[in-house]
């Protein structure tokens, strides 16, 4: 029977006893009430999720504790729930988990229940609630929190021993046992990455894990760090799933996008635009070509990664301009080929469309306008089928026009008669200003027989003129597929010093050993160690230093 119901039963029974007038007066030992209370308690213990008590009740118990008043069992449970609670009436007071004065008393209360085997599941759930609710990005730096973690792990065994039959919630806790260890989140993250079915929603309810818990951050940190352990084809297969996670977990969306884009940049696919990844990045972070958005991008990814996406957009715009927006002429493959060579150097591109392109209701045009909303301008002053393309390379803006017979115009940034981000541009006043352009080049003589390594005709003249402006064609960097199984000797220089004490220990541990070391932490990845042959001594030491084993890859370990 719960303490409240038991007290009520005793008070009513005592009142009736004292007011009894004769032998015929109603006698009632309240068996039905006691039975109902017992049934309620059993149902409570069977429940998958134990509801969190109101903050008002938790704070009342915390205040009684600080006033050194004697607490009932129920009040102690409220204290266990409130170890991470801030009291708005006393903003200068630390939470109990950070209170060196009062936490020892709480610690003794928990230890007493553990030693006497009287810790109930509701008490254990209350401790779990505080453990996961503690607001600290690195909770392990708090020794009181670490003590609590140990009590919860021990307390589970006490609770389990008191239950005759194993409950479904117990199986979930035991499967995700690492949540009460320094390796918290490892099992869940590996399970998620492997695409295995999981009981994450059940765990969230059973272990009283709030949405704001440090555990979710830990899970995603571990999960995203493991992307670096995947080979490129494996990673490519995971991108759609990662984008699904980004849509589902808004709180970690930026972290997921940062890790995915960075990993893609370091893959062999870098120069191949990933349509879904590009669209998601534009939706969440806007256009990296716009000056107003570049600071936002640089909050999340390095400049080379942002440049990769800008290159994707430039290639996309060039393809659309010379194919979809060719006006009333044929596709100019020569101009498309020439400018694609510079796409990876283009920091900004803008398509300026005439009336026909804006009003065309063909499915290709409708889709194009929808996907590029906010990235298109209106062209006035020309023929309805005219379109223009603005490209920024280094300090210059280059303007091409749809259809043949138009020269290319180039302007120095800061001296151009137009703002390339303007919503409306005039073909004659802005884009074809002979007096302010630094270059005006026709597309003659005709270019024929060109290929990836050879240019002909007018392209040769263009290359010469661009070199005078300090612009040279740079072949796209060849990115080799790295076989993670390949063997190479380990040396101290393979490991960068980021955490001096730990990284120096790792250097000395792997030096001269038969293993492969890959340190990509400065690129947002992980430090991984693959032992070529089993070595129990080294593997134990790696675990002690905080490394985690890689799922399905024996003798391989990683650390962030």
UniProtKB/Swiss-Prot annotation:
One of its GO terms (biological process) is defense response to virus. Keywords: Antiviral defense. The keyword Glycoprotein does not apply. Disruption phenotype: When this gene is missing the Zorya system does not confer resistance to SECphi27 in E.coli. The keyword Nucleotide-binding does not apply. NCBIfam families: anti-phage_ZorC (NF041789). Component of antiviral defense system Zorya type I, composed of ZorA, ZorB, ZorC and ZorD. Expression of Zorya type I in E.coli (strain MG1655) confers 10,000-fold resistance to phage SECphi27, 100-fold resistance to lambda, and 10-fold resistance to T7. While most T7 infected Zorya-containing cells undergo abortive infection, a minority produce viable phage progeny. These eventually accumulate to a high multiplicity of infection, leading to culture collapse by 2 hours after initial infection. ZorA and ZorB probably assemble in the cell inner membrane and exert their effect there. This is Zorya protein ZorC. It comes from Escherichia coli O139:H28 (strain E24377A / ETEC).
């Amino acid at each position: 029977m719960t303490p409240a119901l038991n007290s009520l039963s005793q008070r009513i029974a005592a009142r009736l006893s004292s007011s009894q007038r004769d032998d015929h007066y109603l006698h009632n030992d309240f068996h039905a009430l006691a039975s109902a209370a017992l049934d309620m308690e059993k149902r409570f213990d069977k429940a998958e999720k134990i509801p969190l008590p109101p903050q008002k009740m938790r704070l009342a118990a915390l205040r009684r504790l600080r006033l050194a008043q004697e607490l009932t069992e129920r009040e102690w449970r409220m204290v266990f729930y409130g170890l991470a609670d801030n009291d708005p009436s006393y903003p200068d007071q630390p939470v109990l988990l950070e209170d060196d004065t009062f936490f020892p008393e709480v610690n003794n209360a928990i230890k007493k229940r553990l030693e006497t085997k009287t810790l109930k599941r509701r008490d254990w759930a209350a401790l779990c609630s505080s453990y996961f609710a503690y607001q600290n990005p690195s909770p392990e730096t708090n020794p009181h929190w670490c003590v609590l973690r140990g009590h919860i792990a021990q307390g589970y065994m006490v609770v389990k021993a008191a239950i005759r039959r194993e409950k479904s919630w117990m199986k979930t806790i035991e499967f995700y046992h690492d949540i009460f260890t320094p390796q918290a989140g490892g099992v869940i993250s590996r399970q998620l990455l492997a695409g295995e079915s999981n009981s994450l929603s059940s765990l969230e309810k059973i272990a009283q894990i709030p949405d704001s818990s440090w555990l979710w951050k830990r899970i995603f940190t571990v999960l995203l760090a493991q992307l670096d352990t995947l080979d490129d084809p494996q990673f490519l297969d995971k991108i759609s799933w990662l984008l699904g996670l980004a849509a589902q977990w808004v709180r970690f969306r930026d972290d997921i996008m940062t890790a995915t884009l960075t990993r893609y940049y370091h893959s062999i696919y870098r120069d191949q635009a990933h349509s879904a990844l590009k669209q998601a990045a534009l939706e969440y972070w806007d256009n990296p070509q716009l000056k107003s958005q570049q600071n936002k991008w640089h909050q999340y990814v390095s400049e080379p990664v942002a440049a990769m996406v800008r290159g994707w957009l430039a290639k996309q715009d060039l393809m659309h301009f010379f194919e979809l927006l060719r006006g009333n002429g044929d596709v100019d493959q020569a101009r498309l080929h020439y400018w694609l060579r510079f796409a990876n150097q283009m920091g900004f591109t803008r398509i300026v469309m005439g009336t026909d392109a804006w009003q065309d209701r063909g499915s290709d045009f409708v889709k194009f306008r929808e996907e590029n909303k906010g990235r298109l301008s209106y062209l006035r002053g020309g023929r309805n089928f005219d379109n223009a393309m603005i490209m920024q390379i280094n300090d210059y803006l280059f303007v091409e026009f749809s259809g043949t017979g138009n020269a290319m115009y180039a302007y120095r940034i800061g001296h151009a008669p137009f703002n390339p981000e303007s919503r409306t541009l005039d073909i004659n006043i802005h884009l074809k200003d002979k007096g302010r352009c630094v270059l005006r080049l026709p597309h003659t003589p005709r270019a024929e027989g060109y290929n990836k390594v050879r240019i002909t005709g007018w392209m040769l003249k263009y290359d010469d003129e661009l070199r005078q402006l300090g612009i040279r064609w740079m072949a796209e960097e060849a990115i080799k597929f790295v076989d993670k199984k390949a063997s190479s000797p380990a040396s101290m220089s393979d490991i960068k010093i980021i955490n001096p004490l730990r990284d120096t220990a790792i250097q000395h541990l792997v030096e001269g050993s038969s293993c492969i070391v890959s340190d990509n932490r400065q690129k947002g990845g992980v430090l991984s160690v693959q032992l070529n042959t089993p070595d129990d001594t080294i593997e134990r030491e790696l675990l002690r230093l905080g490394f985690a084993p890689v799922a399905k890859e024996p003798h391989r370990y990683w650390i962030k």
